[in-house]
């Protein structure tokens, strides 16, 4: 059975909006639920445009997942075949300062969603977990069997939600759940119309680089250049957001398989790239020089993290197609057209 009606929580966000577009283009009908805490409704207006005639199969509700009655209303109006759950707060530093905010938002939101899904007989879920659950891995590449641990409250919310999902499946084998552990999503849709638009100071390398390139910040701070890596800077597995979005569609297809329980897949490229290599690729793509300031290591930052991709390749039939050149090219296309993100636009932000 082809999952036709999909609810996407957090669908106005960075990864969510790109996934919603790929879903629409793939023939799905999509209902987005997002409280717009860290996103803009403009992203969905642009998704609708990019989807052309497929755009009419998109609807949006500005709702917080903790608002049970609003969520129940949405589930009673549409019979969903599956849910893709992106919604959650994701700033590591803020999670350390405000742990209860993170636990309340991410855990209570997810538990409410799972309860309402069960109540309405929708037991197919794709959850956006994160490579952060590997903590500081003792070796690489990270396989799905590695022990999981987390270094901050944000990471713990991802880890706890994974455990909750395993317990829900353990209690009721009608559930089919896929946990996707993303590595480091970067880039943007090749149109340059949607992309990453973090509020406040970005936590991740590439949104920071993009803000330096468009003149919003004076320099990039590199945390640690004394790691035991090729150039002393931290190594991560960067993945193009379009590849990541396509991974979610592969996961939805997998949910149609009757033999599935609660499964975990890494979504990465399997290649490690250092901070300096990434900055260099971005400078080439943009023609801009990124001034660097070297600082000490950030506590809790791992040295080298990249994915083992074998399981996703063999079981989801999915493989990342794009390299860092395309990631940087598409990122710059988005950033140069939208230097202030969605606030650069004159589109009405009120609906």
UniProtKB/Swiss-Prot annotation:
Pathway membership, UniProt: Carbohydrate metabolism; galactose metabolism
One GO molecular-function entry: UDP-glucose 4-epimerase activity
Residues the record marks as active site: 154
Keyword DNA damage applies: no
Binding site for NAD(+): 13-15, 34-38, 64-65, 86, 90, 158, 182
Keywords: Carbohydrate metabolism, Galactose metabolism, Isomerase, NAD
Stated regulation of activity: Enhanced activity by NaCl. Inhibited by UDP.
Cofactor section: NAD(+)
Signal peptide start-end: none
InterPro entries attached to this UniProt entry: NAD(P)-bd_dom, NAD(P)-bd_dom_sf, UDP_G4E
Enzyme class per UniProt: isomerase
A GO BP entry: galactose metabolic process
Temperature-dependent activity: Optimum temperature is 35 degrees Celsius.
Tissue-wise expression: Widely expressed.
Phenotype reported upon loss of the gene: No visible phenotype under normal growth conditions.
Catalytic activity, as annotated: UDP-alpha-D-glucose = UDP-alpha-D-galactose
UniProt: substrate binding residues: 130-132, 182-184, 203-205, 221-223, 236, 298-301
pH effect summary: Optimum pH is 7.0-9.0.
Subunit field text: Forms homodimers and heterodimers.
Purpose: Catalyzes the interconversion between UDP-glucose and UDP-galactose.
Protein name, UniProt field: UDP-glucose 4-epimerase 5
Gene: UGE5
């Amino acid at each position: 059975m082809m999952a036709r009606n999909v609810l996407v929580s957090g669908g106005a966000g960075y990864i969510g909006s790109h996934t919603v577009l790929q879903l629409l283009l793939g023939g799905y009908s999509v209902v987005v639920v997002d409280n717009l805490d860290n996103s803009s409704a403009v992203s969905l207006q642009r998704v609708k445009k990019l989807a052309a005639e497929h755009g009419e199969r998109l609807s949006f509700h500005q709702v917080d997942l903790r608002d049970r009655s609003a969520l129940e209303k949405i589930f009673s109006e549409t019979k969903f075949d599956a849910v893709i759950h992106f919604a959650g707060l994701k700033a590591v530093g803020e999670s350390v300062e405000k742990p209860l905010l993170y636990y309340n938002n991410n855990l209570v939101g997810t538990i409410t969603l799972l309860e309402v899904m069960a109540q309405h007989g929708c037991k197919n879920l794709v959850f956006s977990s994160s490579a952060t659950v590997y903590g500081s891995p003792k070796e690489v590449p990270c396989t799905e069997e590695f022990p999981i641990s987390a270094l901050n409250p944000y990471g713990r919310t991802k880890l706890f939600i994974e455990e909750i999902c395993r317990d829900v499946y353990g209690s009721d084998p009608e559930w089919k759940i896929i946990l996707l552990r993303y590595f480091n999503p970067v880039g943007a849709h090749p149109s340059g119309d949607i992309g990453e638009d973090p509020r406040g100071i970005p936590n991740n390398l590439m949104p920071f680089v993009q803000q330096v390139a468009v003149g919003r910040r004076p320099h990039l701070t590199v945390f640690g250049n004394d790691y035991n890596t090729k150039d002393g800077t931290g190594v991560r597995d960067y993945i193009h957001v379009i590849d990541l979005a396509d991974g979610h569609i592969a996961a939805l297809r997998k949910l149609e398989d009757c033999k599935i329980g609660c499964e975990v897949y890494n979504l990465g490229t399997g290649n490690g790239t250092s901070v300096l290599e990434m900055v260099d690729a971005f400078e080439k793509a943009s023609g801009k020089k990124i001034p660097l300031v070297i600082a000490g290591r950030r506590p809790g930052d791992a040295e080298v993290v990249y994915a083992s991709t074998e399981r996703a390749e063999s079981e989801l039939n999915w493989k990342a197609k794009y390299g860092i050149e395309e990631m940087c090219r598409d990122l710059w296309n988005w950033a140069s057209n939208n230097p202030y993100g969605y606030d650069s636009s004159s589109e009405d932000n009120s609906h």
